[in-house]
């Protein structure tokens, strides 16, 4: 199997990672899409061979690295793409492993104001009135918008984990591998954003059709008790709406967009505050 080039997509949920994957996959040289299981498989293998397990003395460092590289090779063996963008929110928390396994890899981190992330997830929840979605495991978490948003913001949950992992990566030793892409700029200026992404990953530019973008994963969404979680509308455009969150809940999360004012951070940023410079 010819060597593939690997890059990664991560960041916050409901912030354009599936949309970005749907756009990138228009390029016949690229493979991209919704979250893959690779990051979870890497974590599982590391857990199995780490100190405290009976396998730790049987698998040395070089063997571990070869096994983990083999996960990528095996998972993408039937994929003919030259360049793979593997998506998972966990990559920002495992960026050291990523850098060791794929020294030239870059990571595109999609972000969005956290208040609007919560708004989007709340809309998903309310869209299935007679379904207990997989987002919340018990009645106490599902009870109200207050308990739902608080649960999602926990450090080991959908929004909180991704947010904290991104903060860690932005000030880590591999921050120069990161490009932060604000959802609002992606949907309002997609051609410019994609051009910057191509420059960042060092690939020749490709002319994308932002009027005919498509992606859907109904089987995956159905197992979560949700509808359209990974459905991408054909046209990339701004869609304005009024929030359905109570004002106090919205205000609680609207101030958390730390990427708009990053100091001493080596990450490349395409964010709202500096949209004209894409600094």
PLM feature spans:
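PAPS-dependent sulfotransferase catalytic domain
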Residues: 62-78, 119-200
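Glycine-rich phosphate-binding loop used to anchor ATP phosphates in small-molecule kinases
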Residues: 71-97
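Short beta-strand segments
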Residues: 9-11, 84-87, 109-111, 180-182
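PAPS/PAP-binding and catalytic site of the sulfotransferase fold
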Residues: 16-30, 98-102, 180-205
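Short catalytic/ligand-binding loop motif for oxyanion handling, primarily in non-cytosolic enzymes
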Residues: 18-21, 40-42, 92-95, 115-120, ...
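PAPS-dependent sulfotransferase catalytic core
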Residues: 1-71, 78, 126-128, 220, ...
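Conserved phosphate-donor/acceptor-positioning beta-strand/loop module used by diverse small-molecule
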Residues: 87, 98-124
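PAPS-dependent sulfotransferases, especially Golgi type II membrane carbohydrate sulfotransferases
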Residues: 1-7, 152-155, 163, 167-173, ...
């Amino acid at each position: 199997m010819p060597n593939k080039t690997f890059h990664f997509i991560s960041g916050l949920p409901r912030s354009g990672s599936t949309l970005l994957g749907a756009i990138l996959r228009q390029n016949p040289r690229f493979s991209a899409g919704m979250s893959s299981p690779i990051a979870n498989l890497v974590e599982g293998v590391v857990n199995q061979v780490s100190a405290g397990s009976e396998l730790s003395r049987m698998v040395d460092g070089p063997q571990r690295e070869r096994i983990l590289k083999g996960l990528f090779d095996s998972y993408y063996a039937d994929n003919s793409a030259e360049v793979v963008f593997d998506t998972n929110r966990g990559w920002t928390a495992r960026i050291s492993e990523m850098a060791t396994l794929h020294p030239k890899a870059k990571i595109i981190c999609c972000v969005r104001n956290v208040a609007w992330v919560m708004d989007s997830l709340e809309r998903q929840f309310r869209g299935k009135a007679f379904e207990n979605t997989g987002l919340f495991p018990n009645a106490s978490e599902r009870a109200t918008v207050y308990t739902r948003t608080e649960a999602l913001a926990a450090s080991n949950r959908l929004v909180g984990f991704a947010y904290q992992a991104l903060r860690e990566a932005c000030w880590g030793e591999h921050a120069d591998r990161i490009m932060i892409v604000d959802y609002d700029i992606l949907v309002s200026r997609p051609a410019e954003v994609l051009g910057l992404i191509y420059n960042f990953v060092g690939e020749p530019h490709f002319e994308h059709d932002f009027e005919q973008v498509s992606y859907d994963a109904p089987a995956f969404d159905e197992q979560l008790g949700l509808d359209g979680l990974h459905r991408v509308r054909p046209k990339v455009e701004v869609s304005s709406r009024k929030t359905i969150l109570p004002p106090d809940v919205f205000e609680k999360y609207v101030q958390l967009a730390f990427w708009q004012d990053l100091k001493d951070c080596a990450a490349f940023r395409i964010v709202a505050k500096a949209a004209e410079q894409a600094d």
